[in-house]
Amino acid sequence: MSKRGRGGSSGAKFRISLGLPVGAVINCADNTGAKNLYIISVKGIKGRLNRLPSAGVGDMVMATVKKGKPELRKKVHPAVVIRQRKSYRRKDGVFLYFEDNAGVIVNNKGEMKGSAITGPVAKECADLWPRIASNAGSIA
């Protein structure tokens, strides 16, 4: 898969359960000053009539900051989902889920705006986004 289509990511993405529809509020797990992120769209979703676009681990979304620093609020930021509460199946057959939904703010190339991530990052996300993997404290 070409780097151009995935916005600075590497490798192929496997299908996982999508647990975050448009309108979901997720935690912001980096040190940019944002507390939460409100998902307004999902990158790469074509969609079907009346179906809400949904995101899963490793997906890039467009989000706004609802709580956090005033300079981050009232703007649209690209973000990547790093954890989701909805269980998803890995290729080895194990089902995995996290205790919260979380994302990190990135730029259009997939480089993080912050410099640290709180909590674990899903392996699926770390494989797709090398800049996020390098800032992750732990990869689960």
Swiss-Prot record:
GO terms for molecular function: large ribosomal subunit rRNA binding; structural constituent of ribosome. SMART domains: Ribosomal_L14. GO terms for cellular component: cytosolic large ribosomal subunit. Transmembrane segments: none annotated. This is Large ribosomal subunit protein uL14. InterPro entries: Ribosomal_uL14 (IPR000218), Ribosomal_uL14_CS (IPR019972), Ribosomal_uL14_sf (IPR036853). It is found in: Cytoplasm. Its main location: cytoplasm. Component of the large ribosomal subunit. Belongs to the universal ribosomal protein uL14 family. Pfam families: Ribosomal_L14. It comes from the Eukaryota. Gene3D superfamilies: Ribosomal protein L14. Component of the large ribosomal subunit. The ribosome is a large ribonucleoprotein complex responsible for the synthesis of proteins in the cell.
